């Protein structure tokens, strides 16, 4: 039995490593820790290889996007999203301005999705889905073009929203994670299937935790 387990771990080491870094990534995301981005870069690099060897091409290209958006998200989170440092500070639960030894809040704050932004992102999702589906059906041998296109397109939108610290991105992740879990189960990627089930559960936790820190603009 131990030999079988050892052999399985050896044969799936790269995927298992990617799954572990992925879980660490989501934990850091829930905690709104900026170090989620470098961890995400490592996880994405691993899954580029995993998805390529499994012929899940749209998800492979998605990981390339994750690498790029991780760099941008890292910058936005550190600089407050505009390159200007926020001047508000938090003390005893109240937002104040000034010095007096108070810690300056420079990181991007959690906000709600604006209606106009939501419309734009919906249009972007539809365009991405159609484009991805046409590419997969005409230029690749992907066996799951519909689900692959859906997951990839929605993930691109969700990751951009995460980089901007928009609260509603968690709703998108809930959908993405459970649809992805079914896809990976059918492809025999069992460590990744377990990972996305965990992702789905953690998305509900993230939804609750981020709600506590939403910036109320007056």
What do the predicted segments below correspond to?
Residues 1-32, 36, 80-81, 111-218:
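Polytopic alpha-helical membrane-helix bundles and their juxtamembrane interface segments
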Residues 17, 36-42, 58:
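Generic alpha-helical scaffold signal
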Residues 34-36, 49, 60-64, 89, ...:
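Generic low-polarity alpha-helical segments
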Residues 40-49, 148-154:
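Internal transmembrane alpha-helices of multipass membrane proteins
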Residues 42-85, 106-107:
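Hydrophobic/aromatic-rich structural module bridging two neighboring secondary-structure elements via a short loop
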Residues 53, 72, 101, 179, ...:
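A generic structural signal for solvent-exposed, polar alpha-helical segments
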Residues 66, 101-103, 184:
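Extended rod-forming repeat segments used as scaffolds/tethers
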Residues 82-112, 214-218:
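Short, basic, low-complexity termini and linkers enriched in Ser/Thr/Gly/Pro
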């Amino acid at each position: 039995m131990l030999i079988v387990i050892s052999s399985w771990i050896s044969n799936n080491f790269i995927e298992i490593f990617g799954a572990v870094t992925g879980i660490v990534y989501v934990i850091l995301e829930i905690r709104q820790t900026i170090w989620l981005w470098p961890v995400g870069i490592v996880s994405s690099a691993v899954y580029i290889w995993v998805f390529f060897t499994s012929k899940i091409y749209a998800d492979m290209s998605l990981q390339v996007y994750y690498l790029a958006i991780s760099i941008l998200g890292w910058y936005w989170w550190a600089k407050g999203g505009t390159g200007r440092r926020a001047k508000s500070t938090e003390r005893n639960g109240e937002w104040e301005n000034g010095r007096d030894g108070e810690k300056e809040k420079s990181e991007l704050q959690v906000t709600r999705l604006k209606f106009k932004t939501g419309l734009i992102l919906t249009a972007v999702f539809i365009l991405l889905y159609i484009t991805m589906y046409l590419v997969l059906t005409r230029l690749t041998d992907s066996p799951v073009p519909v689900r692959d296109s859906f997951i990839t397109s929605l993930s691109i939108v969700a990751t951009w929203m995460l980089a901007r610290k928009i609260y509603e991105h968690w709703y998108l992740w809930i959908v993405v994670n459970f649809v992805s879990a079914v896809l990976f189960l059918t492809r025999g990627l069992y460590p990744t299937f377990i990972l996305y089930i965990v992702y789905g559960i953690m998305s509900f936790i993230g939804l609750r935790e981020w709600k506590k820190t939403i910036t109320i603009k007056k």
